């Protein structure tokens, strides 16, 4: 009976850990960029608390067959690498955490955020 209670407690604790929010794997804050729609309108997209450590192809510009986004602004708590190509390929630049907006000449299709500092 003691073993059964120990196993049940361990499984319950494991399930609780899995249910915790994934904020430990995300940057905290906002990352924004701009792009021009097919109708010629400038739009701004915001990623709120984006995932860290994995490549993110950006909405509306993450395909090499469409015009790139531009003017990225990293207001998260981690540095980010922005890529001119999709799937985190091509020319790349680093933007600091809580940085100033980049110039509109800086094109972006995909990004990868650093892991947050503990």
PLM regions and their residue ranges:
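Compact beta-sheet-dominated domain cores in extracellular/mature segments
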Residues: 2-118
């Amino acid at each position: 009976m003691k073993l059964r209670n120990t196993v049940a407690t361990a499984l319950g604790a494991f399930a609780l850990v899995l249910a915790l929010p994934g904020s430990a794997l995300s940057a905290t804050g906002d990352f924004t960029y701009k792009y021009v729609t097919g109708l010629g309108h400038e739009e701004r997209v915001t990623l709120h608390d984006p995932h860290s450590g994995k490549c993110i192809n950006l909405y509306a510009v993450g395909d090499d067959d469409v015009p790139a986004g531009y003017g990225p602004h990293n207001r998260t708590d981690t540095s980010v690498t922005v890529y001119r190509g999709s799937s985190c390929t091509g020319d790349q630049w680093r933007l600091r955490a809580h940085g100033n907006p980049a110039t509109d000449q800086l094109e972006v299709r995909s990004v990868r955020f650093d892991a947050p500092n503990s």
